[in-house]
Amino acid sequence: MTERKNLTTNQGTPVGDNQNSMTAGLKGPTLLEDYVLIEKLAHFDRERVPERVVHARGAGAHGKFVTKKSMKKYTIANFLQEEGTETEVFARFSTVIHGQHSPETLRDPRGFSVKFYTEEGNYDFVGNNLPVFFIRDAIKFPDVIHSLKPDPRTNIQDGNRYWDFFSLSPEATTMIMYLFSDEGTPASYREIRGSSVHAFKWINEEGKTVYVKLRWVPKAGIVNLSTEQAAQIQAKEFNHASRDLYEAIENGDYPEWDLYVQVLDPKDLDSFDFNPLDATKDWFEDVFPYEHVGTMTLNRNPDNIFAETESVGFNPGVLVRGMLPSEDRLLQGRLFSYSDTQRHRVGPNYLQLPINSPKAPVANNQRDGYMPFKQQTSSINYEPNSYETEPKENPAFIEQEQEIRGDISGRLIAEKPNNFGHAKEVWDRYSDAERAALVKNIVDDWSGVRDDIKIRNLRNFYQIEPEFANRVADGTGINLEEHVADLK
């Protein structure tokens, strides 16, 4: 016979009646001394934390990453040195713009983030399924997100807002080519690719630095939905991607992704007609070949979504020895913003939560704050100090010195913007079916968008490829010729 398990308060005292509040007699008022009631209501009032300002809707899973090819020639990162090295990971997939309980069928980039619990500390891969972003400079990040979020007056997402922003931000054109393809509505999280979007630096034992981008390729293949297919699913199910991921893992059908690295020698940085460190530019595989790094397998669902999937925090600046951020202007802003939002959302000690806490030992002088439940206990909480048993800095882990490019400090316009060349590359690489889907999806999304905004976007599209602009214009009933004469 199973031993009875008592219901208790958070203080551990058994609860005798969880159905009726304590009152002053049968018809009297409820008593303030009812500790069970007050504790229960007070905790309920505080169950939620602010949702993420982006990537609020997400699903996650635990798993492992196995290094399949040594990366010694590129980096001294410990977990990438030897073939066969296994590293515990937690992955989180998400939509970007919409709220925590929004449909997973909406057109949106998909977040693709992985926390590696390495022997030398945590490493966060923070990416998307799409290989580029809307903007190249972090100073515009709040603006692009505001344009895509609901109107603050109506609380309704409005195409006039984001297409207005896009039309005046021509660097967004390549992202538009991806987002409004069917890849903007993926079939499931198991069938999306992942990209670091940004370039990073890897440094090897000799101190040689290379720029890299990282790519995840799903072993299940990339599968997308048409707008009509997405609408059919949404009519029946808001949670199709989360459900699919959860059920696949529960059934032992563990999703897998191969990780690849693309490498650029710094001496070749100026060899292109674009800036390879610009987040609005893709590194196409035939120009920057893929090298296989390893394989990630997700094999365990979270035990508690709030404590794990909701509370996990990522930052592209969380890197291990042998890795550094690049000079990418968007990345540089994200290095601050991501941990800052976790401190606001979860608390200053969010790294002490089990899902965020490294497996590597933590030894420093950062103490106290709200909820310090993994408090360090030494009486010496300063450094330098003369106590041999206390943690000391280790010069072996000093970051490799990096060359600074440029000699002027100021708000300088990015060099080689090439806002339309990469979008043209994407168009040229699309099949006829992919081009047709892109045009249709844009035309459908322009329902209700003002003509002046459409025309500004069409002028951008014309500079990508006249055929593309003409097909979108035909779909919207706009006479393109009178609006692009000066571009010919």
From Swiss-Prot:
Q: Which domain of life is it from?
A: Bacteria
Tell me the name of the encoding gene. kat
Q: Which residues form the active site?
A: H55, N128
Which cofactor is recorded for it?
heme
Q: Its Enzyme Commission number?
A: 1.11.1.6
Task: List, alphabetically, the InterPro entries matched.
Answer: Catalase, Catalase_AS, Catalase_clade1/3, Catalase_core, Catalase_haem_BS, Catalase_immune_responsive, Catalase_sf
Per the entry, what this protein does is: Decomposes hydrogen peroxide into water and oxygen; serves to protect cells from the toxic effects of hydrogen peroxide.
- In which residue ranges is the amino acid composition biased (Polar residues)? 7-23
GO CC entries: cytoplasm
Reaction(s) catalysed by this chain, per the record, are: 2 H2O2 = O2 + 2 H2O
An example Gene Ontology biological process? hydrogen peroxide catabolic process
Q: What is this protein called?
A: Catalase
Q: What protein family does this chain belong to?
A: Belongs to the catalase family.
Protein location: Cytoplasm
Gene3D superfamilies to which the protein is assigned, alphabetical: Catalase core domain
* PANTHER family membership: CATALASE, CATALASE-2
Keywords, sorted A to Z: Cytoplasm, Heme, Hydrogen peroxide, Iron, Metal-binding, Oxidoreductase, Peroxidase
Major localization class:
cytoplasm
Q: What class of enzyme is it?
A: oxidoreductase
